[in-house]
């Protein structure tokens, strides 16, 4: 991108990095945006979003903090770029599967796998526009699969959002549970519900004190979602 894009996005806002012109250098820099992003993902995987700072990132790269600002303007730039790098890990099929349902469910499973590998990514994805090239390519895959299946424009938009929101939301919840004392918290909550069974009979009777099977719960929910999408769009 060589000319500045016309956009109402604030220069320092999440997502602004995608609409800002790239800086051109006459010499080959020792520090590159790819190196910055790779280091950022490593730090985010280790410490999470709150602990990431430009200074820590510079230390990781053995560089001066000011040298980062040639490539990125803010921490939000770094987060946007790192998140899009994670979306780039989501593998897309070379060929379509037996049906659009298979393609969508396979995509959801693959997106879940990648987001669980980077526990910070799902929660971050819900806070900013996913406008990077990798995220857009994955959205294009979903939209194209739905359109080819016969979904109308309004249904493509709604179903596409449902797919991403289901995966991002479920992974966000799973990541929170897994990065605390899940067994202890579930046991305490189960006891709390049993003591108040008159107030919460359905919860007390169905809450999985042992945590259940996250993968099985996700897969079952994905089947419900896709079946509902098909029924709503009249494609059963």
From Swiss-Prot:
GO terms for biological process: negative regulation of DNA-templated transcription; response to antibiotic. It comes from the Bacteria. InterPro entries: DNA-bd_HTH_TetR-type_CS, Homeodomain-like_sf, HTH-type_TetR-like_transc_reg, HTH_TetR, Repressor_TetR_C, Tet_transcr_reg_TetR, Tet_transcr_reg_TetR-rel_C_sf. Residues 53-72 bind DNA. Signal peptide: none annotated. SUPFAM superfamilies: Homeodomain-like, Tetracyclin repressor-like, C-terminal domain. This is HTH-type transcriptional regulator SACE_5812.
């Amino acid at each position: 991108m060589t000319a500045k894009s016309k956009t109402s996005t604030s220069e320092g806002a999440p997502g602004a990095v995608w609409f800002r012109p790239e800086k051109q250098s006459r010499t080959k820099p020792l520090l590159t945006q790819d190196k910055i992003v790779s280091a950022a993902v490593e730090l985010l995987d280790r410490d999470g979003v709150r602990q990431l700072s430009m200074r820590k990132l510079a230390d990781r790269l053995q560089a001066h903090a000011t040298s980062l600002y040639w490539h990125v303007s803010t921490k939000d730039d770094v987060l946007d770029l790192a998140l899009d790098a994670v979306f780039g890990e989501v593998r897309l099929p070379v060929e379509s599967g037996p049906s659009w349902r298979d393609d969508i469910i396979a995509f959801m499973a693959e997106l879940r796998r990648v987001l669980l590998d980077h526990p910070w990514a799902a929660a971050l994805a819900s806070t900013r526009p996913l406008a990077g090239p990798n995220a857009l390519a994955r959205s294009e895959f979903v939209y194209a699969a739905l359109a080819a299946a016969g979904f109308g424009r309004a249904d493509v938009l709604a179903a596409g959002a449902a797919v991403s929101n289901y995966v991002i939301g479920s992974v966000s919840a799973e990541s929170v549970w897994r990065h605390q004392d899940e067994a202890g918290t579930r046991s305490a909550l189960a006891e709390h519900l049993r003591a108040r069974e008159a107030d919460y009979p359905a919860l007390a009777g169905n809450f999985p004190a042992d945590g259940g099977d996250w993968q099985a719960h996700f897969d079952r929910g994905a089947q419900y979602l896709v079946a509902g999408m098909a029924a709503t769009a009249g494609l059963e």
